[in-house]
Amino acid sequence: MLYEEAKWIGAELLKISKPGIRMLNIGSSSHEFRANSQPYINEFIFRPLTENNITVLHTDIVDEKGVDIVGDLTDEIFIEKLKQEKYEVIICSNLLEHMINRGPIISAIKEILATNGFALITVPYNYPYHLDPIDTMFRPTINEIHKKFHEFKLKKGEIVIGKSFRKNKFQKNYWQQINQNPKLILKLLLRCLVPFYKPKVWFYTIISMKNIFKPFSATCILVKK
């Protein structure tokens, strides 16, 4: 998650929140990731919510510390379990680009979200190819991601320019991420010369290199059911 993206998410969630509501953060990752690897996630999003008596439950397919509900959002039984809890807000941040089949996850969000509830969705807009464990290079515009939730009303949409955070340093673009690693630069340049080996990965690498000096950004939308 980008630094400014976390600020945007936190600010929008506070605007629509009131004490007593329940939020579900899907694809949440661990407490270690939210509090230490990218500490601004906790600082700008979850700490203010906690201070305002907002309940946030974190769900992920991986059982780690900080994951409240472990389960697979493509599993109908698991979805039915979540639907019974009546979540007024669902957060889905930087998950959809890692799904080969996004349909079941999007359908799950629509099913689980309470009537008149809000879904806050973010995905990268300009960010290089990164495996976690895969990256489909899904980099939609505001309209493209809203079309996935066309039954919902778009309350706000923005392309948020921001900085990434890796190895305790901020980076504004891909060049700043790789310029201290000559071996990686050489590897990327050589990869660009071999289009016939794993052509899809080659294409994604070309896109990443093409945008090497462009600022990182994320597509962020808030929709209402």
Specify the residue positions occupied by each region the protein language model found.
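Extended interaction regions within the primary functional domain
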Residues: 8-12, 26, 212-214
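S-adenosyl-L-methionine-dependent methyltransferase catalytic module, highlighting the catalytic core
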Residues: 100-111, 118-224
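Helical cap/lid subdomain of alpha/beta-hydrolase-fold lipid enzymes
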Residues: 1-4, 26, 201-205
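Short, surface-exposed alpha-helical recognition segments that flank or form part
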Residues: 1, 97, 211
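Conserved SAM-binding loop
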Residues: 21-131, 143-146, 221-223
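Hydrophobic, Leu/Ile/Phe/Ala-enriched alpha-helical segments that form helix-helix packing faces
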Residues: 12-14, 49, 149
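Short, flexible hinge/linker loops that cap or flank conserved catalytic cores
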Residues: 17, 50, 213-214
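Class I SAM-dependent methyltransferase Rossmann-like catalytic core
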Residues: 1-20
